[in-house]
């Protein structure tokens, strides 16, 4: 049998499917998620139910968002899950997660995410950060390193700044390729993201922060002065106490917010 087949389902490359099969890893992830009935529990990409089943066992209802129609049909017919699942068939990148929030209950979101959409999906979920208690995701290890990176490191970039603006980021565990079917060509890791109730450095317009960080990191080897010359003058850099000769990966989240707020105030 092909190593891409698991429980009778053939993994689809276009959906980035790698199914988690290691029971020990599954138990550790479920322990980190800590399922409960006090939150709206939401799984993105439930696949063949490796996390879905143990999470649903301890709660009354689980909401899932799945793109693959074949997998949706399997979930609808699942003997123990079908009565507990609220299934949304569709693309998580376009899904309005705010519709899942119930009065007085925030979301806990989790999933073994398709690696080909993990970065854009992070940016999409940050839009709903105020309605989310926490998130636990299996990601490519490289992406977890980027999410949790410190200024001055190679992994530090636009994703780092936006993730750490919205959330506390905590790596949970590393997961080797043999924990999946089919085995991915990269190492994986689980990360916990906890959105701030009160942001340490509030930005007056998050879209401006996103635009500024994108512009700054477009040319990583160039200086801030070079990359942001159409947005911030040398005098303004000096007023903020920011060295304009530094490269974008040397600037803290707090400093990026300060620059974005300055640009907003000039409008």
Swiss-Prot record:
General function of this protein: Specifically dimethylates two adjacent adenosines (A1518 and A1519) in the loop of a conserved hairpin near the 3'-end of 16S rRNA in the 30S particle. May play a critical role in biogenesis of 30S subunits.
Enzyme Commission number(s) from the entry: 2.1.1.182
Signal peptide boundaries: none
NCBIfam families for the chain: ksgA (TIGR00755)
Catalysed conversion reaction: adenosine(1518)/adenosine(1519) in 16S rRNA + 4 S-adenosyl-L-methionine = N(6)-dimethyladenosine(1518)/N(6)-dimethyladenosine(1519) in 16S rRNA + 4 S-adenosyl-L-homocysteine + 4 H(+)
Residues reported to bind S-adenosyl-L-methionine: 18, 20, 45, 66, 91, 112
Record keyword NADP present: no
Any one cellular-component term (Gene Ontology): cytosol
The name this protein goes by in its record: Ribosomal RNA small subunit methyltransferase A
Subcellular location: Cytoplasm
Major localization class: cytoplasm
Source organism (scientific name): Shewanella sediminis (strain HAW-EB3)
Gene name per UniProt: rsmA
């Amino acid at each position: 049998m092909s190593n891409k087949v698991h429980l009778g389902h053939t993994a689809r490359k276009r959906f980035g499917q790698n199914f988690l099969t290691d029971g020990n890893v599954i138990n550790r992830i479920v322990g980190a998620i800590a399922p409960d009935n006090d939150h709206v529990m939401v799984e993105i990409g439930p696949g063949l139910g490796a996390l879905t089943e143990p999470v649903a066992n301890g709660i009354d209802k689980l909401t899932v968002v799945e793109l693959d129609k074949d997998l949706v049909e399997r979930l609808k017919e699942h003997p123990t899950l079908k009565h507990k699942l609220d299934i949304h068939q569709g693309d998580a990148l376009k899904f309005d997660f705010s519709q899942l929030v119930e009065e007085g209950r925030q979301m806990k979101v989790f999933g073994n995410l398709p690696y080909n959409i993990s970065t854009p999906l992070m940016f999409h979920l940050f839009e709903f950060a105020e309605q989310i208690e926490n998130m636990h995701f299996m990601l490519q290890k490289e992406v977890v390193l980027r999410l949790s990176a410190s200024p001055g490191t190679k992994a530090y970039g636009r994703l780092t700044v936006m993730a750490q603006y919205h959330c506390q980021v905590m790596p949970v565990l590393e997961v080797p390729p043999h924990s999946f079917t089919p085995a991915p060509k990269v190492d994986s890791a689980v990360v916990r993201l906890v959105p701030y109730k009160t942001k340490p450095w509030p930005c007056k317009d998050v879209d401006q922060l996103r635009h500024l960080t994108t512009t700054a990191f477009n040319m990583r080897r160039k200086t801030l002065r070079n990359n942001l010359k159409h947005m911030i003058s040398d005098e303004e850099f000096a007023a903020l106490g920011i060295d304009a000769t530094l490269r974008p990966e040397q600037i803290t989240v707090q400093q990026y917010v300060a620059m974005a707020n300055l640009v907003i105030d000039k409008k």
